[in-house]
Amino acid sequence: MAHPNEDLIRKGFNAFSTGDMEALRNEFLAADVKYHVPGKSPISGDYNGIDEVLGFFAKVFELTRGTFRVELHDVLANDDHAVVLSPASGQREGKTLHDNGVLVFHIKDGKTTEVWLHPSDLYASDEFFS
């Protein structure tokens, strides 16, 4: 049987992949969630609160004209955290992104409270989104 936080992550990834922002808002993200995106691109930075995080997701979809995709390769979960191995891809202005990222989730009371995104190639990610 999977850990409850693994189930939460799998449901969250499914909601993200299908564009179900209401499920992300109501079932996956805490109201005061923090999301950290490294780098120097226009999307890099810290997003605070559910509206900023969902706005970040919308910006990624907008910049890639809906081509951005994530896969859930694997999830490692315990009572406080989940670590996700997640290939991502997208198209933007003639550029293609293929990245094997890692995301670290802090989870409390069945909701994601903080996320740290770690692209495998930060330089390529910055170039793609710049």
Task: Give the residues covered by each predicted segment.
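C-terminal and inter-domain tail/linker signature
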Residues: 1-130
